[in-house]
Structures are given as C-alpha cells and as structure tokens.
Amino acid sequence: MGELAQQGVRCVALEASSHALDQHRLDAVNINVGVFTNLTRDHLDYHGSMAAYAASKAKLFRRTELTLAVVNGDDPLARLMLAGCTSNVRVLATGQDEAVTLRVLDWQAFEQGQQAMIATPEGEKMLSLNLMGRFNLDNVLLALAVLYGLGKPLDALFAAASSLRQCRAGWSAMVMPTRPALLWTMRIRRMLFIAHSKRCAPT
C-alpha cells in the first residue's frame, strides 16, 4: 500500500479478510467503502464458529471513517454487518429483496453470458453481461452499487458493465454434445475442474 501511495495511487479495491480485520492488520488503512458479498463455511479452523467468523467480518462496517456500505441484501447476515454502521454511513443493497437499491426482477442465462432486468432508483434497466455464472451478476451488481454510491451515473455504469469480458484463467463454457446442460470449466495448474452451472462450485 505504501508503494502504491508513492506512485500516486489514490483509490484501491482490496479484500478485507476476516484474518486481517481480526488481527488489526488493516488499522492503518483508511477504508471509506465497505462491501459485503456473503459468508460461507470457510476459515472455521481459525475462527472456530460461523458466529465468530461473522463477527470478525462485521468489524469492517464499524470503522469510523466508513461513508458507504454496500451489501448483498439476500444474505441473512447483511443486517448483522450493517448493525455496527454509524449514522453517517450511506447504505445501499443489491439482490432480489424488494427493499434493495438494485433489484433483480428477471434473469436469463445464455451460453456465453446472461441478461437481467434490474429495478434501480432511476427506473428499470436491462443489464447484459458477457460473463457466465449467476455469481458474476451478483458481484457486478455490488460493484455497480459502489460506483453509483460514489456518484457515477447509472446509465454509464450499465453500459460499461456490458463490455466486461471473461478472464482467460476464469470460467469458460463447455457444451456436452450428448447433454443439454451447460457446464463450466476452470483450469488451475493444469487441473481441469468441472462444476454444475447451478452452483458454479468446483467438485
């Protein structure tokens, strides 16, 4: 971070891991925007329980310098994260719940991407992505909410999102000739993992 500051970088996106928050390794970093995607059963060897894991993550939203909090409103732990926010923190949410800022009204997946109708504070807008997997839609919506919260226009954000492309090292489509299902593949260190499109989790 120090080297980036010396190079003139003024804004950085980083993962505030539960370990870093718990061990105070981010105390010297000025974090203005906090984003919560979800919690899965990871790092329990360190935290001991999901409750302790969630409590560590929630520390991100108790920081006094925070001005914007963006959460996945469909995750039941979102309220826990927001409970520690001070009154000057603006809160935005994404998901399918009626109360969220960017709400998914309809969603369709295709062989090389997906499309969703999104209810926004400025009306309904179509979001087209060249990214596969529902998790990518969820992540893009969170990123759009962050930029919207920072003052960027929604129309420009939706247009920019449509130009995103899959990373070469990421997920790619593999259509089996004898099966109608669309599978996802990912190469990691010469190993091929196949995941069902419904969950997009390597097995």
Q: In which residue ranges do the predicted regions lie?
A:
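Conserved alpha-helical scaffold flanking the Walker A/P-loop in AAA+ ATPase domains
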Residues: 1-3
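Acidic, Mg2+-coordinating active-site environments of NTP-dependent enzymes
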Residues: 6-14, 22, 31-181, 202
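AMP-binding/adenylate-forming catalytic core of the ANL superfamily
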Residues: 187-203
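Active-site-proximal beta-strand elements of phosphoester/diester hydrolases
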Residues: 181-187
